[in-house]
UniProtKB/Swiss-Prot annotation:
MF term (GO), any: hydrolase activity, acting on carbon-nitrogen (but not peptide) bonds, in linear amidines
Stored InterPro entries: AC4CH, ASCH_domain, PUA-like_sf
Name of the protein: N(4)-acetylcytidine amidohydrolase
Keyword Hydrolase set for record: yes
All copies of domain ASCH, residue ranges: 7-93
């Protein structure tokens, strides 16, 4: 079943709105989106809408395959990215990279 919205922690809102964050790494349950799909984006904490995004593509990626390029697209260093993934998805190896672009209002 396709996602009909996506949430991000509030701490990522500025990076998304500024265009600094252009991907998100998710588990399998949150990977059900398709190229071209438009999703409303809300904060995880309060479900407050702050923008819409369009999905560019979805690619499986293992935690061990993450590179500095992934980290740059997340607007983090690689160690920061690995720490965030470990915090959100402890013990998970298989991730899905969702590349997106923000839709201007």
């Amino acid at each position: 079943m396709l996602l009909n919205k996506i949430t991000f922690f509030e701490r990522f809102e500025h990076d998304i709105l500024s265009g600094a964050k252009t991907i998100t790494l998710r588990d399998e349950a949150e990977s059900h989106v398709i190229t071209g799909q438009i999703l409303p984006v809300s904060t995880f904490e309060t479900d407050r809408w702050f923008c819409d995004i369009q999905i560019i593509d979805v690619t499986p990626v293992k935690l061990t395959e993450l590179t500095e390029m992934h980290a740059k697209q997340e607007n983090m260093t690689l160690p920061q990215l690995r720490d965030v993934i470990a915090e959100i998805y402890p013990g998970l190896e298989q991730l899905f990279m969702i590349r997106f672009r923000i839709l201007l209002q």
